[in-house]
Amino acid sequence: MGSLRIKHSGQVFTPDYLVADILDFCGYVESPRILGKHIIDNSCGEGAFLCEIVGRYCRAFRAGNDDIALLKDELQTYIHGIEIDAGTYERCIENLNLVVLKFGVIDVDWDIIEGNALKIKIYDGAMDFVVGNPPYVRVHNLETDYTDVKQFTFANGGMTDLFLVFFELGLRMLSAGGRLCYITPSSWLNSLAGESMRREIVLRKYLTGVVDMGHFQPFKATTYTLISRFEKVEDNDRIDYNVYDERVGKIRHIDTLSYDEIQINRKFYLSGKKELELLKRIRLSASDSYVRVKNGFATLFDDVFIGELPFMEYTIPVLKASTGKWSRAFFPYDEKGSPLTYELLSECESVCRYLED
């Protein structure tokens, strides 16, 4: 996909393995429990989410019922989508038809709307599940007038991004007890643009789970990403904090956090309880007795220089300001700040193996 298309339309298509993980995290799993439940992808693209959804629905239905006519009727009733681009919309319909053909279903009158999701209200309060990968595009890059964007509460702060509006749109579509699950940039956790959204989250307490993708980059568009799960339930104060383990391609649970634990100065931070407690003491204390910052620096290649390094030589402790997480950084410099020679580094076998890999 061209960079201009990403910049102006925000279309970034989702890999199949992530689609499956997101649906699982949302609770839309292949079982009788999803039958008769309304689900929508309100920026459905070519149907990455909808194709997996339809496949799961068909398999769950056929496990206990061979009535193809009834299956067709339920697909037309419970599966929904919206796509603004005409060509992409047509490819979505074609892809969905190919999926149901495997189950002996033809001529489905899909409830997929070609249109602007920001102007469509027929799904408000009616969805059991809202899922997807909403468009990432700053309002000043929109190809059309962004007055539709600015009417949303979540757009009232900073240089807003379209995906923030889709959070508000998705929550509006949920019925009582419904679930929303998106993969988006993680910037809403602490950006000025995300302040209105965070304020609403604290008020309603709909956020129930996150998956921090960390340095793993599932898209060509370079950005830190996060899977967020919201549920329209009352009296919730539990947020499941997970990370994505790219080594095994699985979501791994780290901790269960409260709303108080993730908030510092009206911003959200994600980590384990101990790390968050330390970060809160640092951020809220007027004293510098906890941590003295000697230097701030940018590596421009965190995947190599920062993380769980397989050696201790030539490393220093670092605190990542954006996340509040402690780690270690490869620091191949002497006390005067001069780079160490290759000959000196070569004396440490573990460092050599790491750099060669």
Model-based region annotation:
Residues 1-210, 215, 227-229, 233-238:
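SAM-dependent methyltransferase catalytic region
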Residues 72, 220-223:
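Short coil/turn motifs at beta-sheet boundaries
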Residues 219, 226-357:
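C-terminal substrate-recognition regions of SAM-dependent nucleic acid methyltransferases
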